[in-house]
Amino acid sequence: MQINNQSRDVFYVSDGTAITCETLGHVVLGQFPFIPNEKTFPFVESQDKVADVVKEIETSYQRNGVKPLVFFSIVVPGVREMLLEAPAYSYDVLESIVQKVQDDIQMAPAPKLQRSRSVGKDSDTYFDRIAAIEYTLAHDDGITLKGLEQADIILLGVSRSGKTPTSLYMAMQFGLRVVNYPFIAEDVKMMRLLPEFEVHRHKLFGLTITPERLNEIRENRLSGSDYASEEQCKLELDTVEALFRREAIPYINTSSLSVEEISTRILERAGMKRRLFG
């Protein structure tokens, strides 16, 4: 992970899944104009595990000359103390909120490992989430168009417009079954809505992006290619947006939005409700 004026190393560390750390971290970092180089460490429940994390943090500091940012949620005192000794700017994502609730309700918290929650206790929620994730992964990037009747929403857009991360976030956080389908360069010559989507028009939602941002993203992946050229990016976007307008498919521009914001706006625009919370 290299440091420059537009990037910084960020670590998410938790004794649970780290989803809370990532979610809150993304919201906070979205307020700052730099690109986070992120790494996540879930289920850090022992001093041995946190020692490995500390080594990574130390390596980042030594390599870049600046302290990385660490968003964490750790219950075990010994593990927490070891993490706080690392050369980083560390932020407990729950501490200030828990303290405020404690002050307001005059009740001491009883911290416990996030992992200790029983699957059986929330089995319906757990299996709904797993089913949504499995469905979404199976329908990522146009892998298959079978089973569209089970989809909650179908995301359309050019390659690298944010469909995959948005799909997975909606599955993981909201328990929604999401299909995402990419329009590729060959589609531009005869852009049309696939017959498979006709009966599911009410589920269609488009993602678009500015040509400049798309060019930047594609250059990082395939620098100097026709695929990444400004001309190709603009051509694809103009063609796809024309399709969205012609077919009355709602869409949003993802250029300056976080995955969390994209997902929430889709729910709002599509009039959908979350199946799960958190």
UniProtKB/Swiss-Prot annotation:
It catalyses: [pyruvate, water dikinase] + ADP = [pyruvate, water dikinase]-phosphate + AMP + H(+); [pyruvate, water dikinase]-phosphate + phosphate + H(+) = [pyruvate, water dikinase] + diphosphate. ADP binds at G157, V158, S159, R160, S161, G162, K163, T164. Pfam families: Kinase-PPPase. Signal peptide: none annotated. InterPro entries: Kinase-pyrophosphorylase, PSRP. Keywords: Kinase, Nucleotide-binding, Serine/threonine-protein kinase, Transferase. One of its GO terms (molecular function) is ADP binding. HAMAP family: PSRP. Bifunctional serine/threonine kinase and phosphorylase involved in the regulation of the phosphoenolpyruvate synthase (PEPS) by catalyzing its phosphorylation/dephosphorylation. This is Putative phosphoenolpyruvate synthase regulatory protein. It comes from Vibrio parahaemolyticus serotype O3:K6 (strain RIMD 2210633).
